[in-house]
Amino acid sequence: MTEREKCQLGLLYDTTFPGRDEDNLRCLDLCHEFNQMKPSDLAGREAILRKILHRVGKNVRAEQNIYISFGYNIEAGDNLFINHNCVFLDPGKITFGDNVFIGPCCGFYTAHHPIDTDLRNQMLEYAFPITVGSNVWFGGVAPGVTIGSDVVIGAGSVVVHDIPDHVVAAGNPCRVIRPITEADREARRAVRK
């Protein structure tokens, strides 16, 4: 089994495997190009994002600056918005559903390092996937976390445990505050009138 395959399976792997640095530098060059573009060049910025990300649906937009380790491990549905200064450490897979709104300074960290110093000093790490459902608006997410659909994550929250569908969650660590109810939906309808 190759080190890249171990990485994709969430197994301890050697981060110095051949090709990894080249993949990282290719992505960082694209991020640099994106970050230097005029903010008004929306079409050009979207084109660079589509070069970076493995798969993305319609209507992807990111504000500057972004940092993405590899890009080929990130997939998103339609209507992805990434606000300023977001970080995606993606040796593991990051998947976003449709209608995902990422607040400023959010981080998605699939890399996880061993507690044991001997292993860590050998440049070994794990990569655990992050999965985000549809209709989600939130802050930072830790490795191995799944966030359900129709979720609101409060500002400044650090998500270290899975969050189910149809809830408001917040805090550090992030926890479910309450379900999203029919009253919330009715309030939304009233605002639209």
Question: What is each PLM-predicted segment?
Answer:
Residues 1-59, 174-193:
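Terminal amphipathic alpha-helical/low-complexity segments used for targeting or macromolecular assembly
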Residues 66-76, 81-146, 172-173, 177-190:
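Flexible, glycine/small-residue-enriched loop-and-beta-strand segment within the central core
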Residues 152, 168-170:
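Short-chain dehydrogenase/reductase
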